Amino acid sequence: MKKFLTLVCVSSLGGALTLGAYKHFFEASEITKVVENQPKASLFPVNLEKHFDGGTNIDFTTAANKTVHSVVHVKNTTLSKGYTSFEDLFFGRSQQREQIGTGSGVIISPDGYIITNNHVIEGAQSIEITTNDNKTFDAELIGTDLNTDIALLKIESDESLNYTTFGDSNTAQIGEWVLAVGNPFNLTSTVTAGIISAKSRDLSGQNTQSFIQTDAAVNPGNSGGALVNIKGELIGINTAISSQTGSYIGYSFAVPSNIARKVVEDIMEFGNVQNGILGVIGGELNSKNAKDFGVDQTEGFYVTDVQIGTGADRAGIQKGDIIQRIDGITISKFSDLKGFLNTKSPEDEVQVEFLRNGTIERLIVTLEKLTMIEIPIIGTLEEASKEALQNLNIEFGLQLSELSETHRKGWESDGIYEGSFVTEINDENINSVNDAQRALEKYSNKVLRIAVVKTNGEKVMYRFR
């Protein structure tokens, strides 16, 4: 039962779906995001030829023409240490080698802001943008969000740039025609077509994602490219594919535009993502869980607890309520709820429609600032009071409110319990959830270093790979 519970107010890390970039020394290669999914299909971020009924009246030319000139090629250059001979390896003499990865991006403003995937530019020493008319620009990384795999870049141009406008991904319908535009296999802007196959797809198995699923062909190098409707409006950022080979075999996945837009707007305004929380604990209903909880509903979000003092608590949400809609958006599973909350900010008011004792009720809930974060290796961290910090004679840190159940025994055997503090992550002082998010974004695929102050005041440093 405990595994069923999901803490809605916690912004889970997106590392579960972080898939490796295919990079080779001295030559460019397309960055591909892959997700292992049992022995079934795996998942890659990235385009098969389709043959459409010649009798269809759908015209894709307007959307294609509006989009191809705003989709760009992204080249990510990194430097890594390597050994050129056995002697170098034996004596520890390493040399820096250049690695290049490529992907796609979408210009979203005439002054050069570009949205792409975080995994496309991760670890870059330099980023080069090539537009559809073969002009090249050096790009500045403005910010990233590991949770949603979204990054914001900026280029400077003397001319106004072609750009794509955001559409409303909430209004996109299953069965609706869409175009995927990107730069697969280092080609210039390439357009493929398909339909929306599903919405609110969670590929991680941890209820942390909410993708648009399409059958538009997407291949290595398409990561960060545009998913647009037939009006040419941006409704998603192509991020992953379902495949066992690394190439397209039927399904691709995109971050919904409403989520991507919220992320980049927050990065522009605050430098990081501001998450609004509801303040409830629970999980999605299905036939098994419904039986466990003694309810006859098999869809919706079942509230097992309400956090004291949160917006949900003040509004009157109660344990046992089944959330079915928020602001008119149907909540049939957790990824629906997660996807909706990822588009909202602290202080936003939302109308929550829920089932209580067989009666539909509605309440207005004010979302609050995210004050906690989950690090899977250790557990849930919360912003603490000054008194709690003073009790351990420390000036900053996040307090460990709940140990990871998976690793609890190991931590407790080392004297780490709830109430301990994480004061540093990757050599960065941690005084807020935003500090922790930024530090973790620098971690990906590297050694993770965490400084912990025990409840007895002892400070210990841990390293994880």
Predicted regions and their residues:
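Short, low-complexity, Pro/Ser/Thr/Gly-rich segments in the mature regions of secreted, periplasmic
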Residues: 456-464
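Serine-dependent protease modules
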Residues: 3-319, 325-349, 355-362, 366-396, ...
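Short, exposed beta-strand-loop hairpins at the edges of beta-sheets
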Residues: 441, 450-453
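Helix-turn-helix DNA-binding module
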Residues: 421-423
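Conserved catalytic motifs of ABC-family nucleotide-binding domains
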Residues: 320, 419
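A beta-hairpin/wing motif
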Residues: 281, 464-465
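Alpha-helix N-cap recognition
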Residues: 333, 432-435
